[in-house]
Curated annotation (Swiss-Prot):
Modified residues (5-glutamyl glycerylphosphorylethanolamine): 301, 374
Organism: Apis mellifera (Honeybee)
Family as reported in the entry's similarity comment: Belongs to the TRAFAC class translation factor GTPase superfamily. Classic translation factor GTPase family. EF-Tu/EF-1A subfamily.
CDD domains recorded: EF1_alpha, EF1_alpha_II, EF1_alpha_III
Spans annotated as G1: 14-21
PROSITE patterns per the UniProt record, alphabetical: G_TR_1, G_TR_2
Taxonomic lineage: Eukaryota, Metazoa, Ecdysozoa, Arthropoda, Hexapoda
Record domain tr-type G: where: 5-242
Residue ranges, annotated region (G3): 91-94
Name of the protein this chain belongs to: Elongation factor 1-alpha
């Protein structure tokens, strides 16, 4: 095997019928974790149901159905390999909670793959005011996914098939609006593909002889190639934030006989080690970490991306809960927020939102009602320039700077400092009505319990 490949995460976005499932299914199918037996089983079922033409998407539909029913399917199924990377598809839209997942997402996407359909009338429908293409691309950019690849799909459906003119027309149009959102188009690869027939997916297609390939220019190195898989291979690897202060949002807290209290969560930034003194915000509890485990193995250190359980002394299960955040007591420990100011983009709210609105916010693992205390200004989504001071209300499509107050103690951070703790989804009426990125936080100074174990550990030092 040699050296382990780097793991990267991608999110696949685009309008409902653009062929996301087929394209993604094709990659997983050809380069991925699905074994031949499963594929043959799927194909047989698809044929029996008269869905022969649907095999790649069918693979994905089967996986999605299992995922939605809460069957934890083997995550390997959502992975595929390129020459350089192990790629995990962290979510594909169409999934009910896609937007929420993308924000509170267990992991940040390193790159978004935008699929647009080239078929007659299809591209126009996807990019129209109420199509999802713009919304998804805007979301990806707002949430800090700065690398983008565009797959111009269904090239077999253009008139004439594999039309260069149609590809160029779409490329021009998409470039113009992703540029408005904030993407640098020089660094975006455009690839004409057929997710169904496989053109330019893994091998250059003889049907697009006019296509000379994609080129990207960026300060971290230029790249070029002919296919979608090569474009994925040219993604810049993420820098994992080990040099930042520790932030570990708790997913659960267990009581384990003979061991004690074991909080579980994913290290978002920094490093967690046994022997460390940790503070849990917003409760300001401080104690010592006795041990750290991942997949039932003891670790000497846990790094960003690791899902771990760690044993803490002198703290009962009742004192900790999901949504609390653990940090290093000696290095920028996390604190509860009195209030915070965020840029909020309203996606789909049926009415007007005004001061006093109190929906539930999902931020990292926290799920807490927060009050829109003061809508300070409306702003242009792209430039961030103020368009109206102290507006009475905001509605779908608006972006605004808002001061929010949590109704219960809550730990959040500025997006600039700790991205995973600085983006949130606003949930109301069982849907995501808005998304936000936190600009600044007013912290509370809370005096909390310091356990005996922590005091002892401090004396030793």
């Amino acid at each position: 095997m040699g050296k382990e490949k780097i793991h990267i995460n991608i999110v696949v976005i685009g309008h409902v019928d653009s062929g996301k499932s087929t394209t993604t299914g094709h990659l997983i199918y050809k380069c991925g974790g699905i074994d031949k037996r499963t594929i043959e089983k799927f194909e047989k079922e698809a044929q029996e149901m008269g869905k022969g033409s649907f095999k790649y998407a069918w693979v994905l539909d089967k996986l999605k159905a299992e995922r939605e029913r809460g069957i934890t399917i083997d995550i390997a199924l959502w992975k595929f390999e390129t020459a350089k990377y192990y790629v995990t598809i962290i979510d594909a839209p169409g999934h009910r909670d896609f937007i929420k997942n993308m924000i509170t997402g267990t992991s940040q996407a390193d790159c978004a793959v935008l699929i647009v359909a080239a078929g007659i009338g299809e591209f126009e429908a996807g990019i129209s005011k109420n199509g999802q293409t713009r919304e998804h691309a805007l979301l990806a950019f707002t949430l800090g996914v700065k690398q983008l690849i565009v797959g111009v799909n269904k090239m077999d459906m253009t008139d004439p098939p594999y039309s260069e003119a149609r590809f160029e027309e779409i490329k021009k149009e998409v470039s113009s609006y992703i540029k408005k959102i904030g993407y640098n188009t020089a660094s975006v690869a455009f690839v004409p593909i057929s997710g169904w027939h496989g053109d330019n997916m893994l091998e250059p297609s003889p049907k697009t002889p006019w296509y000379k390939g994609w080129k990207v220019e960026r300060k971290d190195g230029n790249a070029d190639g002919k296919t979608l898989i090569e474009a994925l291979d040219a993604i810049l690897p993420p820098s994992r934030p080990t040099d930042k202060a520790l932030r570990l949002p708790l997913q659960d807290v267990y009581k384990i006989g003979g061991i004690g209290t074991v909080p579980v969560g994913r290290v978002e930034t920094g490093i967690l080690k046994p022997g460390m003194l940790v503070t849990f915000a917003p409760a300001a509890l401080t104690t010592e970490v006795k041990s750290v485990e991942m997949h039932h193995e003891a670790l000497t250190e846990a790094l960003p991306g690791d899902n771990v359980g760690f044993n803490v002394k002198n703290i009962s299960v009742k004192e900790l809960r999901r949504g609390y955040v653990a940090g290093d007591s000696k290095n920028q420990p996390p604190r509860g927020a009195a209030d915070f100011t965020a840029q909020v983009i309203v996606l789909n709210h049926p009415g007007q939102i005004s001061n006093g609105y109190t929906p539930v916010l999902d931020c990292h693992t926290a799920h807490i009602a927060c009050k829109f205390a003061e809508i300070k200004e409306k702003c242009d989504r792209r430039t961030g320039k103020t368009t109206e001071e102290n507006p009475k209300s905001i509605k779908s499509g608006d972006a605004a700077i808002v001061m929010l107050q949590p109704t219960k103690p809550m730990c959040v951070e500025a997006f600039q400092e700790f991205p995973p703790l600085g983006r949130f989804a606003v949930r109301d009426m069982r849907q995501t009505v808005a998304v936000g990125v936190i600009k600044s936080v007013t912290f509370k100074d809370t005096q909390g319990k310091v356990t005996k174990a922590a005091e002892k550990a401090q004396k030793k030092k």
